[in-house]
Curated annotation (Swiss-Prot):
Keywords: Acyltransferase, Transferase
Protein name: L-2,4-diaminobutyric acid acetyltransferase
InterPro entries documented for this protein: Acyl_CoA_acyltransferase (IPR016181), Ectoine_EctA (IPR012772), GNAT_dom (IPR000182)
Entry's family note: Belongs to the acetyltransferase family. EctA subfamily.
Bilayer-crossing regions: none
Superkingdom assignment: Bacteria
Amino acid sequence: MYFKMITSAPWVLYPEIGEDPSKKWIFREPKISDGDGIYSLIADCPPLDMNSSYCNFLQSTHFSKTSILVEHKGDIAGFISGYQKPDEQDVLFIWQVAVSPRFRGNGLAFRMLKELLEREALSEVKSVETTITEDNQASWALFKKLDAMNGNHGQVSTFLDEKAHFKGKHDTEFLYRIPLK
């Protein structure tokens, strides 16, 4: 004895099967309506320092050309905030890199960084700078990868010292400067 079984085609039950992978992630400039979502994302990404939500609204408006957001099916999956240094416009300073725990393991941080650096508005950027605490292994790996892609000419120095600047309330921030090819 056998039973007839009627099932839908796999692409009907699981529409993501036929989904174009390039449409899975949307990389774009942040906008004012993203401010609260960015604030929530940063809160979900310790050890990143929390700023006020007002700061995240400023990042998504005043610094939208030098920041990038990636979304997946309407959810904010990641965000990089950055700015061009006022006295060195050819230097892009990366302030924070955040990827939602739900979306880690997809290479989003590096993809966001590459997408950001490929923008026409940043075509004059010759170096990337960021600060990283000693224990933030994810950030070290990300920026070492960027450095390797650009010839391994990056330099690391102490920027803000735990004792001299933070009076023991925050770990030392190391400045990583990466010249771009």
